[in-house]
Amino acid sequence: MRLRTALRSTASALAALALLSACGSGTGASSASGDAPLVGVDYPRSDTDFWNSYITYTPGYAGQLGLSLKTTNSQNDVAKLTANAQTFISQGVKGIAMAPQDTAAVAPTLAQLEAKKIPVVTIDTRPDSGKVFMVVRADNRAYGEKACQFLGTKLKGEGKVVMLEGGLDSINGRDRTEAFNDCMKRSYPGIKVFGEATNWDGAVAAQKLQTDLTANPDIKGVYMQSSFALAGTLQVLKQKGLLADPSDEKHVFVVSNDGIPEELKSIAAGKIDATVSQPADLYAKYALHYLKAAIDGKTFQPGKTDHDSTIIQVRPGLLEDQLSAPLVTLDGGTYGGVPSVKSDDPSLWGNNHG
C-alpha cells in the first residue's frame, strides 16, 4: 500500500514514541537476549496511520516470538531500502522483513540477499521478480471487488463513481484498480467509473475529486484505494455541501481501504460508508512468524493455514499468505453477495489500537 499523505492521529503519536523507545531508526533492538535470532525489519514509511500502526505492533510480536530486532525506515525510497539492507547485512541479521513500495526496483536487493542466504519476507507488496521466503499480504483484488459490490448495491446499478487510484507501479494499486473495473463492467454496467491516478498522494486525490464533482455534480460514489485520501475527500465533500447523512439524498457513498481507527469512526458518524480492514496487526505478526520459520529451516506449501488464511503459489518458487481483510460497514449487512462486519466489531484491529 504505497501512500504519501494521510491522517495523523493518536496512532501516529504512539508510533513516534515506539520508534524512539524501541527502534532507534536502524540501531535499536526490541530484544536484548543474546540467544535470540537477530532479524531486521525495514518500515516502508511513517507518514500514514496504517503504517504507523504496523510499526507499533512489530516490537511486541518480535518479543513474543523470541526474536531480537533491528529496524530501519526506507521512507518510500528504494535507494534507502537498498542502503538499509546493507546496514542489516553488516549487523549480521538472520532474516529481513520489508514492504518494498517499488515492486520492480527492489529486484537487485533481493538478489543480493539471496546470494548471502538471508531469507526475506515481504509485507503488503509482492515483488515483480526475485526470490522471497514468503509474501504476507491480503488479497488486494478482493479489495476492489468488495468496494465495487458495495457501491454497486448502494447505487442500485446506476450512476457515476470516482475511483481514487493508488500507484499503478505497485501490485496493490494495479490489483485494486483492475478488480474494481472488472467488477463494475461485469456486474454493474450502468455505472460510469471515473478512474483518477493519484500515486497515493492525498493532495492530488482531493484536487481530482473536486474537479470531477464540479464537472459531474451527479457523482454518487467514491472509492478511495486507501486512507491516504480520507481527509481530503471529506474536506471536498464538505466544501461541496455533500457531506450529508446517509439518509439524505445528497449523500455520496464513500468506500475506503485500510481499516484505520479514523475510518471506523467516520463510518459510525455517517461520513463514509465502508472500508476494507487491512490487517496491520497480522502483517506485523506473520512477517516475523515467517522469518523465524525460515531461520528454523521450515518450509510451507499452498493451502489453508491455521490462522484463517490461504497460502497460494503466485509463480514458481513464490508463496503468498493471503490474510483475511473483511468489508466493514455500519450495519454489518451483505452487499452484492459480500458479507461485512459492523464498524464497532471488537475483532477489528482499528478498534483496539490507539
Write out the residue ranges for each language-model feature.
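Signal peptide-proximal N-terminal region
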Residues: 56-71, 186-190
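Flexible loop/hinge segments that line or gate small-molecule binding clefts
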Residues: 68, 104-142, 150, 160, ...
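Hinge/beta->alpha junction and helix N-cap segments in small-molecule ligand-binding domains
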Residues: 42-55, 70-80, 101-102, 125, ...
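Bacterial carbohydrate/catabolite-sensing allosteric modules
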Residues: 135-221, 239-253, 269-270, 294, ...
